[in-house]
Regions:
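Catalytic active-site module of serine/aspartate enzymes centered on a nucleophile-bearing elbow/loop
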Residues: 275-312
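Flexible "cap/lid" subdomain of the alpha/beta-hydrolase fold that forms the substrate-access gate
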Residues: 2-25, 32-36, 57, 80-116, ...
Length: 312
């Protein structure tokens, strides 16, 4: 039986529609209504967001990528953006998000794709790629991870994890007050004045009430800090399968990233993917797309051109 879901409209305002003028599209995946945009033609580039963002995070990527002759697909994960938002935690799991993404991309018959993976879009997109290698051409990995995390390391990096897991504080701050989409994102960009003036209300407005914000504080509970965690086996699988993969891979890092610092996490990814290029560094904290979106898009274009052999 389908669970109840919250629905959302695009936050009003000229800035949103100027920066995100794309036709909204929807597919039914695993009983949920999933939103995405599909622009341009050519080999597809799939841009994947995490928590608490939505496709709007990639607004500075679409034009540079389509201008280079690429098809750009930007889904909103179930629970975010314009996709349906299940109001029960049981509807959410990493395996479920991988299955939802798989359902969408198979319906679109996506092949030869480049998966651009950020935050929870990392384990989700990598889960798709490793399960569907015949549909994937290359990987772009930034500010994410794909293995179980030691508790001490994770707590040191992401203090709010403790709030998210507290029985009352997480729902109160992140659910009732939308703290992750507001203050959390604000603290995770470099140019905070621009973000506050232009974009912060867009991320807050797409999650308008506590029911719509469920995933902002429940999804982090799937981060595997020990072998009893719900997502531990899936992250073990990701780590193991990445070692076997041969996808051309570009690593991108924000110089100021406080969540997944490029030295620690790029080193780990290069241990798993010794053929990976990078890390290519840009101005940015965790949400590096906000500060350096167009620059990252051009790095992706250059990386894919090198794969094609069209540029040195």
């Amino acid at each position: 039986m389908k669970l109840d879901a919250a629905t959302t409209a695009v936050p009003p305002g000229p800035f949103v529609h100027e920066e995100w003028p794309y036709e909204p599209r929807f597919k039914r995946v695993n009983s949920w209504r999933m939103h995405y945009i599909d622009e341009g033609a050519g080999d597809p580039v799939v841009l994947l967001h995490g928590n608490p963002a939505w496709g709007f995070l990639y607004r500075k990527f679409v034009k540079p990528l389509t201008a280079a002759g690429r098809r750009v697909i930007v889904p909103d994960m179930i629970g975010f953006g314009l996709s349906e938002k299940p109001v029960r935690e049981q509807a959410h799991s990493l395996d479920g998000h991988i299955a939802n993404l798989t359902g969408l991309l198979r319906q679109l018959d996506i092949r030869n794709a480049t998966m651009v993976c950020h935050d929870w879009g990392g384990p989700t997109g990598l889960g798709f790629a490793l399960s569907n290698p015949d549909r994937v051409r290359a990987l772009v990995i930034m500010s994410t991870w794909a293995w179980p995390l030691p508790p001490a390391e994770f707590h040191k990096r992401i203090f709010p994890w403790r709030m998210m897991n507290a029985p009352l504080i997480g729902p109160y701050l992140l659910g009732r007050h939308n703290a992750l989409a507001g203050r959390g994102m604000y603290l995770s960009v470099v140019d905070r004045t621009r973000f506050r003036d232009e974009a912060q209300s867009v991320y807050e407005g797409i999650l308008p009430d506590p029911a719509a914000r469920l995933l902002t504080w429940t999804w982090p509970r799937w981060i595997p800090l020990d072998d009893t965690a719900r997502g531990f086996r899936r992250f073990e699988w990701l780590e193991r399968e990445l070692r076997k993969s041969k996808f051309p891979t570009l690593l991108v890092g924000g110089r100021e990233d406080e969540v997944f610092d490029h030295k620690t996490f790029a080193t780990r990814f290069k241990e798993l993917l010794p053929h990976a290029v990078g890390p290519e560094l840009v101005t940015g904290r965790h949400f590096l797309q906000e500060d350096s979106g167009a620059e990252i898009a051009e790095k992706i274009n250059h990386f894919l051109d090198r794969i094609d052999g069209s540029k040195p």
